[in-house]
């Protein structure tokens, strides 16, 4: 869903960089070298501060080793080789005089997020702490600095008593000796890495023996024995589960390969990633509020790529960057490959650490290779220019406000005459920071992905793919690359970057974007952006969830002056005009929304209520929003923020119920974390409505619901992209009606009027809570009646499963590349991958997205035939019968059935396809069979002839339709399969027919074929003599001569 696209750049440093990391929540990053701390602003890319140690400080503290940054309290903590932790306080002040890029310019051009230009960064040195046990690693948890000892498995937590920059900073410390707890398995190992994720409120530790531990509540515990932790990643356990074990291989070597080298988390999908020494990335699913971890997926890039150095997840959780010693790869949340350095020869470099930009449109990675002062990479022959920086010294440290940044285009072999500046220290190294630009699919910023339209976004524009507009052309080309570029309004993106949400209408006619504040609507037909007229009003509004289009209206959940509101916009002018705007207030933040029908929607809020809202246009032509009803979901969801989408599905039998009762009869499709679950109503004797939970699919990255009725066979079909591939359910609503709900009993058993407080009752709500994470900032505080102990929830996860009928109806689809969207009206899957290029003139290296389009109809029809649903398969094929490539689709169906590995399944498929073709005679199916024969190896021909007729039967159909070209193709197949003599007379008849109708292409083809059979051209001469005598000629001698020559061909 992220694709390398554009021209990568690089920043070169004149000293060896140890670590780079982004300052959370702001567009700044820090570079740590052995003697310096460099602070860069990303937009515009500028070095705004540099802290350099004095000689005295360097001798006392030693070289820098590790760095950790916290933006909430403005803390920078640096660990040194002499066991000191230096603590700094920084503030970013945009109100200070703007720093200019050069003496000749007054300000930067306002690109995305650059309206303030370079911002003043003020830094204060606050204190230094020395830890006698040595410093192995450190991390910042809120206002506490956590670090691990270098001599024993001991964790030290130093909490700042105050973070006021105007006061003297002091710390209070406590220590945890992990040798006192049983869950820390190897007491002789050390803690080599600390990782804290505030979103899931969990600390992760990596030990020197390659294990990974999870810990809940380090700072809240007062002694070591009260710590709760568990081992998540154990190389010994992974080694036992290997299926390809070699008994002669050294066990210690295998354990060393499985040792963890790096870890990261994905809070949006509740996943923990662990990289190992052999280059494998493991994904662990977090269950039972962080108390259980299950290894579900793994990915290994290449044996030559080396160990995993770094793993970084985007803010939306939809992309994972993995850096190796020699290469990099981007993966989907469940470790499906999206893009890799091996796909292009120009950007094949290793990454030691890095981070995603705030809008995830770029990745900043520190190269794994260091360079000497001669410009030569350590261990390689790669040369690169060096950029010198003048260093200054003060007694303690100094902060430089401005420094030039050199950004150059990447070049694998830099043969230009670069000036290598002299550096006093001959042992000094340089490092390179690579900036990789990415295109981001709009799927990641939408509440529910749309069909028919594919979009990709960068920092300053949106790309809309128009490939589908060419699918009905006469050219049989599925891979046309054509994009419409929609540039964001410059003033808006300059001040409100990053663009957090993008919503595209199903037909691509309307687009909405939302940044930090306000929003904007683009009308494609007019090529016009509509924004707020009042800039102050725009600053008061912030969109809280993905926006949705319904008809010509845009629906957005916003926070406006601390009020939680639903806004309804009409794209006909400025967004703050009364005629184009309607509002409805709520008691809490809107988490997600979905459309029910043409004029209604459901809204889910953070206080755990699901609301049914209706909108319309009144008699005066103004928009109106009306509240219908609500349901309390507090007993069902414990963490509302984990709910990514809620879709209301109404069974066909209940289509005419009153709108006010809609929530109490419908089925709810809920995407929570990576689980797609169904909530259906279950009748009880107490006449209360109970929700029954069933899991439809796990490891869900995104899904589509087809609401278009242009293709009736796919109406209400659901397409789900999971960690194991694309899955499809046809006629989804009908399956729901037949499996989950006994509609008649439900209606008869319900009272006409129910008290609202009794509409939802507790049944198996624990099953939905199993996948939620433990986090005080995300857990909804329920009443006393809803409290429960979550320690036993993991036992119930096996009971959460969908019925067998749903599993049987599931169709698995293959998608080559990374799926962008489903073009249901054209029967195509739209995928993408990256290609690298190099301009030979200026040697610029760049990458661009390449579109691939593949028909999905063969796999669906194949699956329907295996499910004994031939009538449904026939209807589906006839629905797409107008497409110019329908014959190609049916031919692919036949060839895939022929190449099925399972022999019994293959026979069933070929038999079903033959019956299918008999009911599709209007498609001239004999041509499809001939096309498949021409492209299939001869060893498979007997199976085709068994079910679709011998060559003479196919020839008969060709002659009945007077299709000379197909007859010529069939003749060649006949000759190869049964010999030349068996088709000699038929050969002459077809040759004569082609001459009669003056089809010279067929004549030339047949003549060439005779020459290939008899290079001496006796066959061709005899055939021409026979045909030259006319159709009434009965020269037996020439006929016998032609037959004898054909028999001679068969002998050889």
From Swiss-Prot:
Superkingdom to which the source organism belongs: Eukaryota
Coiled-coil residue windows: none
Phosphotyrosine, modified sites: 293
Organism: Schizosaccharomyces pombe (strain 972 / ATCC 24843)
Protein name: Guanine nucleotide exchange factor subunit ric1
Keyword Oxidoreductase: no
Localization in the cell: Golgi apparatus membrane
Subunit structure: Component of a guanine nucleotide exchange factor (GEF) complex.
Biological role: Probable component of a guanine nucleotide exchange factor (GEF) that may be required for efficient fusion of endosome-derived vesicles with the Golgi.
Lineage: Eukaryota, Fungi, Dikarya, Ascomycota, Taphrinomycotina
Gene3D superfamilies: YVTN repeat-like/Quinoprotein amine dehydrogenase
Entry keyword RNA-binding: no
InterPro entries for this protein: Ric1, RIC1_C, WD40/YVTN_repeat-like_dom_sf, WD40_repeat_dom_sf
Entry's Gene Ontology BP terms: intracellular protein transport; positive regulation of TORC2 signaling; retrograde transport, endosome to Golgi
Assigned keywords, A-Z: Golgi apparatus, Membrane, Phosphoprotein, Transmembrane, Transmembrane helix
GO CC annotation terms, alphabetical: cytosol; Golgi membrane; Ric1-Rgp1 guanyl-nucleotide exchange factor complex
Transmembrane segments annotated in the record for this chain: 661-681
Membrane topology recorded in Swiss-Prot or TrEMBL: Single-pass membrane protein
Family: Belongs to the RIC1 family.
